[in-house]
From Swiss-Prot:
<feature type="binding site">
    <location>
        <position position="61"/>
    </location>
    <ligand>
        <name>Mg(2+)</name>
    </ligand>
</feature>
<dbReference type="GO" id="GO:0006032">
    <property type="term" value="P:chitin catabolic process"/>
</dbReference>
<comment type="pathway">
    <text>Glycan degradation; chitin degradation.</text>
</comment>
<dbReference type="GO" id="GO:0005737">
    <property type="term" value="C:cytoplasm"/>
</dbReference>
<dbReference type="InterPro" id="IPR006879">
    <property type="entry name" value="YdjC-like"/>
</dbReference>
<comment type="function">
    <text>Involved in the degradation of chitin. ChbG is essential for growth on the acetylated chitooligosaccharides chitobiose and chitotriose but is dispensable for growth on cellobiose and chitosan dimer, the deacetylated form of chitobiose. Deacetylation of chitobiose-6-P and chitotriose-6-P is necessary for both the activation of the chb promoter by the regulatory protein ChbR and the hydrolysis of phosphorylated beta-glucosides by the phospho-beta-glucosidase ChbF.</text>
</comment>
<keyword id="KW-0460">Magnesium</keyword>
<keyword id="KW-0378">Hydrolase</keyword>
<dbReference type="InterPro" id="IPR022948">
    <property type="entry name" value="COD_ChbG_bac"/>
</dbReference>
<dbReference type="InterPro" id="IPR011330">
    <property type="entry name" value="Glyco_hydro/deAcase_b/a-brl"/>
</dbReference>
<dbReference type="GO" id="GO:0019213">
    <property type="term" value="F:deacetylase activity"/>
</dbReference>
<dbReference type="GO" id="GO:0036311">
    <property type="term" value="F:chitin disaccharide deacetylase activity"/>
</dbReference>
<dbReference type="GO" id="GO:0000272">
    <property type="term" value="P:polysaccharide catabolic process"/>
</dbReference>
<keyword id="KW-0624">Polysaccharide degradation</keyword>
<keyword id="KW-0963">Cytoplasm</keyword>
<keyword id="KW-0119">Carbohydrate metabolism</keyword>
<dbReference type="GO" id="GO:0052777">
    <property type="term" value="P:diacetylchitobiose catabolic process"/>
</dbReference>
Amino acid sequence: MERVLIVNADDFGLSKGQNYGIVEAYRNGVVTSTTALVNGEAIDHAAQLSRELPALGVGMHFVLTLGKLVSEMPGLTRDGLLGKWIWQMAEEDTLPLDEIAHELACQYQRFIDVFGREPTHLDSHHHVHMFPQIFPIVAHFAAQRGIALRIDRQTVLNADDLPSDLRSTQGFSSEFYGEEITEACFLRILDASAHRGEASLEVMCHPAFVDNIIRQSAYCYPRLTELEVLTSASLKAAIAERGYRPGCFLDI
C-alpha cells in the first residue's frame, strides 16, 4: 500500500531564520509542507520565498497565543497582545468564541492577501485549534472552504462530530520535538503509523536557523537539530525504503 507522508514545518513567517530553515529543509531535506503565522514579523519574507517554491504546500498556522491580532479581540488580548493565558481561559470556559471565529476569518483573509492564494490547510500555533471549545469552529470553517485540517485524533473526543466532508491525514504525530530529535525517532513514528494501517501521515516539525527572534523562544536550539536531521540523506533514503510518498495536503 502506498502511503502519503506530509512533513509539515510550523512557524513559517515567525522570523527570517525560521523561514530560511524551512526552505533549506524543503530544498535539501524531507519537508514537504509548511504553515504560516500571518501575524509573524517575517510573514512578507515568507510569502516572497514561497513564490520561488510553487510546489511547497503552504497552509495557515492559526495564532491565538503570540503577537498581535489581525482583528479587534478585547476578550482574549492583554495590552493588545496575545499570550498563553488562553489555557487558563479554556479551563475556566471563558473563551470569547465569537471573537475567535471572527479572528479566524480575518487571519484567513490576511493569508490570501499576503500569499495571493488560499492555504492548502489549517493548523494552529500551540495546537489551540484542538481545544474542545475551539475545534468545532475551526473544523466547520475548514470544511466550508474545502481545505484540509490538522487533526490529532487522540485529542478529538468524539470523531462522529467531525464534518463528513472535512479532509485530514489519517495519522498525525508531534513526537519529533523536544529532547529526542533523532532519525530513529522519526522512523519510529513512520513505523507506528504503518502498523496502524494509516494511508496518510503528517509529522510536525520546526526546522530553523537561529536568529534574534528565535533566540527569544523557549524552543530555540532544538530547531537547529531538527534541521540537521531533516536534511540527512540517510533519513530520506529510509523514508523511501518504507514505501512513503512525499506529499502535501493537496494530495489527500
